[in-house]
A protein has these predicted regions:
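Conserved N-terminal beta1-alpha1 strand-loop-helix module at the mouth
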Residues: 1-227
Length: 227
């Protein structure tokens, strides 16, 4: 199981996540979000990471010129389209900056079925997505609500690797280990406040997901990561 921690704003938090063994970190480039960062902040945050941890740029309906500007200044690895972007728009935008990409789909438990979710995933797979992220639907927000959707809607034979998001924390993430997913994505479940990560919550989350690694090991906290 791969783990992505999203919504970093502080270098000390991102360094701790790296030490705990996170696979990817998300930076939010959507000004209305309380976790949004500027280009300058993102440069500092990405520079705090060691090699082999992916930096994911979360964008919401970002114009092409703005995305190109972002890619020219921030060394991110993957785009996470979290707005109303169509498959074609995602493909064109990602090609403009030569990046791999993820599309977030907001799942409405009252309206979606497993078949409809699978059909949406197929559309983005055909456009070249590398993975799909499934989050809970909210009528006025694009994500980060801390809400869960009905996990029984997850397709068993998805055409893309599924990243599960929405309302995850150390207490419930173990229940996802048998789901047909590739990764989990968490933000609020590892925070003490919006954009402020909690070291104990991050540690507990990683311990719950990557139990084998943590069974006989308590990672140290070297001070030289990212320095």
């Amino acid at each position: 199981m791969q783990v992505k921690f999203c919504g970093f704003t502080q270098p000390s938090d991102i360094k701790m996540a790296a030490q705990l063994g996170v696979d990817a970190v998300g930076l939010v480039f959507y000004p209305p979000s309380p976790r949004a960062v500027t280009i300058e902040q993102a440069q500092l945050l990405s520079a705090s990471l060691p090699a082999f941890i992916s930096v994911v740029a979360l964008v919401v309906n970002m114009p092409r010129a703005e995305l190109i500007e972002l890619a020219n200044h921030v060394p991110f690895d993957i785009i996470q389209f979290h707005g109303d972007e169509t498959p074609e728009q995602c493909q064109q935008l990602a090609s403009a900056v030569n990046k791999r990409w993820i599309k977030a789909l907001r799942i409405n438990t009252e309206q979606h079925t497993t078949v409809s979710v699978s059909a949406q995933i197929d559309e983005f797979a055909a456009a070249g997505a590398n993975s799909i992220l499934l989050d809970a639907y909210h009528p006025h927000k694009y994500g980060g609500t801390g809400a869960r959707f009905d996990w029984s809607l997850l397709p068993q034979d998805s055409s893309l690797p599924i990243i599960l998001a929405g309302g995850l924390d150390a207490d419930n993430v173990a229940a996802t280990l048998d789901l047909p997913i590739y990764a989990v994505d968490v933000s609020g479940g590892i925070e003490s406040g919006k954009g402020k990560k909690d070291a104990a919550k991050m540690r507990a989350f990683m311990k719950a997901v990557k139990r084998d690694r943590w069974q006989n090991e308590t990672p140290s906290e070297p001070s030289n990561i990212g320095n």
